[in-house]
């Protein structure tokens, strides 16, 4: 279950994280009233379950209550990537120049069956862009789900990432974020930016928080927070299949097994000159029917012009992946070019199955870089028409 920014901040606040003060508004009048109450410049932020709100005009600085009213009028009812803005978060503005922005996040990595902590001094940017341009600037650290993130580990990660300021305070916030992720069964928690002021005090300015749908029975008090109409239809469908799926802005569908492999796949697609249209982790040990459903899901996205499949077979058999893709092809569901790299268990069997089909839509490559390059070329070729 995806949470809105204000909901994610509320959960983090419950775990002791210092978050930016703000209130939710549903009308321009409410936006103005909140701005007047705060008595200082505010930021009006669209609350929708997609990224890129700022680029779409859904985040506006408002120096006065009247400007806040105007911005509220413009943002409420706005369409952002197919979702209508029905509410906004009005927060006290922060002077970004009077401090430093960082990034911290926790994600479930199915490959290592654990959480991975990520930290970067490149805060305020989309982490996918940082990963694509300068992956060395993202520090990753495996977090034991039994012990959680310990203070000395958090300090070491902050130091490696190049964080400045009071590292003890920053580490304390990272530990509390880790506690929130573990206790709330989150599959993703991000604080971006994590703002550190001149005194060294950290403040969470923006958040992403997503809870595992399979664990919602443990968090029945949050059930009323879910707004299906506020979620992308493909993400709703993905949750029914049990997929870890996130809709993105690009034109290349991405399908892989394990969060680490999928994150890497996003990076190589960016480097190849295209943009990923989604994050889709089919998990470990996926059978042909699971792969079939994954291909069907990605194929429904009109933004997808080609599909990049990146599988490293361990408990996931490559021939099962091939069977699922072939079934989608035979049923006429797969109509977009698939460029894939499959390695590991039953790799040769997969190659034999695909060679027998001999479809120009499906091509295999010896490594993920070549496959991603081919997928990017196919997608960009369609876009250029």
Curated annotation (Swiss-Prot):
Its EC number is 6.2.1.5. Binds 1 Mg(2+) ion per subunit. Succinyl-CoA synthetase functions in the citric acid cycle (TCA), coupling the hydrolysis of succinyl-CoA to the synthesis of either ATP or GTP and thus represents the only step of substrate-level phosphorylation in the TCA. The beta subunit provides nucleotide specificity of the enzyme and binds the substrate succinate, while the binding sites for coenzyme A and phosphate are found in the alpha subunit. Pathway: Carbohydrate metabolism; tricarboxylic acid cycle; succinate from succinyl-CoA (ligase route): step 1/1. PANTHER family: SUCCINATE--COA LIGASE [GDP-FORMING] SUBUNIT BETA, MITOCHONDRIAL, SUCCINYL-COA SYNTHETASE BETA CHAIN. ATP binds at residues 45, 52-54, 94, 101. This is Succinate--CoA ligase [ADP-forming] subunit beta. Heterotetramer of two alpha and two beta subunits. InterPro entries: ATP-grasp, ATP-grasp_succ-CoA_synth-type, ATP_grasp_subdomain_1, Succ-CoA_synthase_bsu_CS, SUCC_ACL_C, Succ_CoA_ligase-like_bsu, Succinyl-CoA_synth-like. GO terms for biological process: succinyl-CoA metabolic process; tricarboxylic acid cycle. Residues 9-237 form the ATP-grasp domain. Belongs to the succinate/malate CoA ligase beta subunit family. It comes from Deinococcus geothermalis (strain DSM 11300 / CIP 105573 / AG-3a). HAMAP family: Succ_CoA_beta. GO terms for cellular component: cytosol; succinate-CoA ligase complex.
């Amino acid at each position: 279950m995806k949470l809105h920014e204000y909901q994610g901040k509320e959960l983090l606040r419950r775990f002791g994280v210092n978050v930016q003060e703000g209130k939710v508004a549903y009308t321009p009048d409410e936006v103005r009233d909140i701005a007047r109450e705060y008595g200082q410049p505010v930021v009006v932020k669209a609350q929708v379950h997609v990224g890129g709100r700022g680029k779409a005009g859904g985040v506006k600085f408002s120096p006065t209550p009247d400007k806040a009213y105007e911005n509220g009028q413009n943002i409420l009812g706005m369409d952002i990537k197919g979702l209508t803005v029905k509410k906004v978060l009005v927060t006290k503005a922060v002077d970004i120049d009077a401090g430093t922005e960082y990034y911290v996040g926790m994600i479930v990595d199915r490959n290592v069956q654990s959480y991975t902590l990520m930290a970067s001094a490149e805060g305020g940017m989309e982490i996918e862009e940082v990963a694509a341009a300068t992956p060395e600037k993202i520090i990753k650290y495996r977090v034991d789900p039994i012990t959680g993130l310990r203070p000395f580990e958090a300090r070491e990660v902050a130091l490696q990432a190049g964080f400045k300021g009071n590292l003890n305070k920053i580490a304390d916030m990272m530990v509390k974020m880790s506690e929130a992720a573990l206790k709330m069964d989150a599959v993703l928690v991000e604080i971006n930016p994590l703002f550190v002021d001149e005194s060294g005090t950290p403040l969470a300015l923006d958040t992403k928080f997503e809870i595992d749908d399979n664990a919602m029975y443990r968090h029945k008090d949050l059930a009323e927070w879910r707004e299906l109409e506020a979620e992308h239809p493909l993400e709703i469908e993905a949750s029914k299949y049990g997929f870890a799926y996130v809709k993105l802005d690009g034109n290349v569908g991405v399908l892989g097994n394990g969060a680490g492999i999928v994150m890497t796949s996003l990076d190589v697609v960016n480097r190849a000159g295209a943009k990923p249209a989604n994050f889709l982790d089919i998990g470990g040990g996926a059978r042909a029917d699971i792969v079939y459903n994954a291909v069907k899901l990605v194929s429904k996205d009109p933004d997808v012009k080609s599909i990049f499949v990146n599988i490293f077979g361990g408990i996931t058999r490559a021939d099962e992946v091939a069977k699922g893709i072939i079934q989608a092809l035979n049923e006429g569901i797969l109509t977009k070019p698939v460029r894939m790299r499959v390695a590991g268990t039953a790799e040769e069997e997969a190659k034999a199955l695909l060679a027998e089909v001999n479809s120009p839509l499906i091509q295999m490559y010896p490594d993920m870089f070549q496959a991603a390059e081919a997928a990017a070329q196919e997608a960009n070729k369609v876009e250029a028409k």
